[in-house]
Regions:
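C-terminal and inter-domain tail/linker signature
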Residues: 1-221
Length: 221
């Protein structure tokens, strides 16, 4: 990627909404072979090419990420997705993407079950020199060609998907579980409020006179 914030939308749609070939192309073009993947439901640790015993086949972590995205498309062939915002921290090489999606299962009739969720995807990027085919030069020293160094592009080193708990619950416990969690959150807020109103003074006095602690952080009214 030359411009991660502008190009990431096409990459995400290729992975989640387009064809099998588009998925594979996006992963091969933009993900490093040892890319890792972290999601509430699954995890792929980073590893390079490993030979499968008793075969001539090799596998790397990017291949497993491809299988995850393929299974995602198999379960939900018609995913509705929108990208609300992107932000690139160039110093840390982190790209943040806020996404809204509607996930439905193909075997549930009449869309009786849908998960309308929001998530923040954090992509760890790595800037590497590339060859003539725009492939990363992994572990190689870039040599100048005609006095010019090979161009550098950003590649995805890893992906982490972050969900709020109420959004996560829509996948594992639909039909009201997220509402119960929201009710618990409101209850916890009430407990915090009541605790401050009725317990701040006795707690501050106890900490000050019995424990000798500085109580300015919970200064009483």
């Amino acid at each position: 990627m030359d411009y991660p914030e502008q190009q990431i939308q096409h990459i995400i749609r290729s992975l989640t909404q387009y064809s099998h070939d588009d998925q594979r192309t996006a992963l091969q073009d933009y993900f490093l072979p040892d890319a890792y993947f972290v999601h509430p439901f699954c995890r792929v640790p980073s590893f390079g090419n490993c030979k499968i015993p008793y075969t001539d086949l090799t596998v790397n972590s990017r291949q497993l990420v491809f299988y995850i995205y393929q299974w995602y498309r198999i379960l939900s062939p018609d995913i509705k997705l929108s990208i609300d915002s992107t932000s690139f921290d160039k110093d840390k090489n982190l790209l943040y993407v806020m996404i809204r999606q509607t996930f439905t299962l193909w075997f549930v009739p009449l869309s009786l079950w849908q998960a309308n969720v929001k998530l923040v995807t954090v992509l760890e990027l790595q800037q590497l020199s590339t060859d003539k085919s725009h492939k990363p030069l992994l572990g190689e020293t870039s040599t100048p060609v005609n006095g010019e160094r090979p161009p550098k592009l950003y590649f995805i080193k890893g992906q982490q998907d972050h969900y709020q708990i109420e959004d996560f619950l829509q996948f594992v416990a639909p039909w009201g579980a997220s509402l119960l969690w929201m009710a618990w959150q409101i209850y916890a807020t009430i407990i915090c409020t009541v605790g401050v109103i009725f317990l701040r003074t006795p707690v501050a006095l106890c900490q000050k006179y019995f424990l000798g602690r500085d109580t300015r952080a919970i200064k009483t009214l």
